[in-house]
Design a protein with these regions (language model features):
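Short hydrophobic beta-strand element within catalytic cores of glycosyltransferases
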Residues: 362-365
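Conserved acidic donor-binding segment of nucleotide-sugar-dependent glycosyltransferases
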Residues: 378-387, 395-400
Length: 435
């Protein structure tokens, strides 16, 4: 064995193809691990021009057209005998699939074979998720299994449920230890009592894993409570953040007490993020002060419903929807923001709150989040306590001494959040398994 552990990393999102928080997290950790391990990363789709130092990246979108080694086979999960197909709601990053989609997949596509041309189409699609996500997961699992014969590795590291099936197959085929990294859970995305196809893949993946790495203690508790995984093999690893975010503030806060203030929500507009609690909080804030607007940045399946609620309440002039924003526009918006709100119902980490803290923005966040653990000097409330959320926002916007104290202390917290710390924590788990 070389001085550096050899890691086979199974990923799904990676720059420049992002759909949610999984991509930035995998990129940050993989990049930081580069100086500690020899890393081979397998992705369903990758742009060859995007490279990471000390990391070998394999994009299946290139392999399907270059090799005849990968054989077609019936789509049949490793766990087919352990999973009951049900007509129910389940999540597909970054949105939820309707019941019709999962029913059609389970009744028809599981009985088909994936041909070479289908593989080429699957991994050439710009949408790396989509309604055919389970078909992509099955094809990814098959191809990773075949590729493993030509890759030298000591440990398998699988990121989130979409790669867990491949990770478990490789573990039993190679007898190499498996690490699964949990960035989000089906019980976060759909409901704590969700027991569907994705939930079963997550549970079986964690049961077969040698180490389970959730992104927070909040997620660790969810894994234990909802999935029944033993505590002794769970080791939380907090995410880092992009420290090269080029933070610039636009103007001075509190320059005028009459200036219109801006409250920001940044993220996917899905049930997991608590958007209806956001609207309720905003209404209570507007009752306390008039010179404030709420900006909702992002998109998601509940965006039309939220827009309807805003129209119904006649708040179109007070609540603004921006839609999807690229990184530069996000930075500009953060530079103009006076307070940040994250009312998530179940948030494994909450990178957007960390990004807001970088901009010296006082943050009001849900207690049901990983960010609450790494940013203890934010104002925190239960997601359903909209009275407290509104009061915290009002105080942050109107009391300069409070705002300054919160942001100064949060800057200290940020020093303990970086990808190198995360990489060293992951390396400790690797060494534990190898020794």
């Amino acid at each position: 064995m070389s001085a550096k552990p050899k890691i086979l990393t199974l990923g799904w999102e990676f720059p420049p193809l992002y759909a949610g928080g999984l991509g930035p997290a995998c990129y940050g950790l993989t990049k930081a691990l580069g100086k500690y391990v020899d890393n081979t990363l397998v992705l369903p789709r990758h742009e060859k021009k995007f490279k990471v130092r000390n990391v070998t990246i394999i994009g299946l979108n290139h392999l399907v057209s270059e090799t005849s080694k990968i054989q077609t086979r019936k789509i049949d999960s490793l766990f087919s005998k352990e999973i009951n197909w049900e007509e129910e709601l389940f999540s597909s990053y970054p949105l939820t699939l309707p019941r019709k989609a999962i029913r059609q997949w389970s009744e028809k596509e599981t009985k088909q074979q994936i041909t070479k041309s289908e593989r080429e189409n699957l991994f050439s699609e710009k949408d790396i998720y989509g309604s055919n996500i389970l078909k992509k997961v099955s094809a990814y699992t098959d191809m990773v299994r075949e590729l493993a014969d030509d890759i030298d590795f000591d440990i398998i590291h699988a990121h989130d449920w979409i790669t867990f099936s491949a990770g478990v197959q490789l573990k039993h085929y190679t007898r190499k230890p498996l690490v699964v990294h949990v960035h989000s859970l089906e019980t976060d995305r759909v409901h704590p009592q969700s027991r569907n196809r994705v939930y079963e893949i997550e549970k079986i993946g964690m049961m077969h894993a040698d180490r389970v790495l959730p992104v927070s203690n909040f997620t660790k508790r969810c894994i234990m409570n909802y999935y029944g995984i033993r505590e002794e093999k769970i080791s939380p690893v907090y995410n880092g953040y992009d420290s090269d975010f080029n933070v610039k503030r636009a103007g001075q806060k509190f320059a005028s007490s009459n200036r219109e203030k801006k409250v920001l929500f940044l993220g996917r507009i899905t049930a997991q993020k608590g958007p209806e609690y956001l609207i309720e909080t905003a209404q209570k804030l507007f009752a306390k002060m008039d010179n404030v607007k709420v900006c909702i940045a992002g998109t998601g399946d509940l965006k039309p419903h939220l827009e309807y609620l805003v129209r119904k309440s006649n708040l179109q002039d007070k609540i603004v929807f921006t839609g999807f924003l690229d990184k530069e526009r996000v930075k500009k918006l953060l530079s103009e923001t006076d307070a940040y709100i994250m009312p998530s119902v179940s948030e494994p980490f909450g990178l957007s709150a960390v990004e807001a803290a970088q901009f010296n923005i006082p943050c009001v966040i849900s207690k049901q989040s990983g960010a609450a653990e790494v940013l203890p000097n934010t104002l925190q409330a239960d997601y359903w306590d909209t009275d407290k959320m509104a009061n915290y926002l009002f105080a942050s916007l109107n009391y300069k001494s409070l705002s300054d104290t919160l942001t100064e202390k949060t800057q200290v917290n940020l020093k303990d959040i970086n990808w190198d710390i995360a990489a060293k924590a992951v390396l400790t788990n690797y060494n534990f398994l190898l020794n």
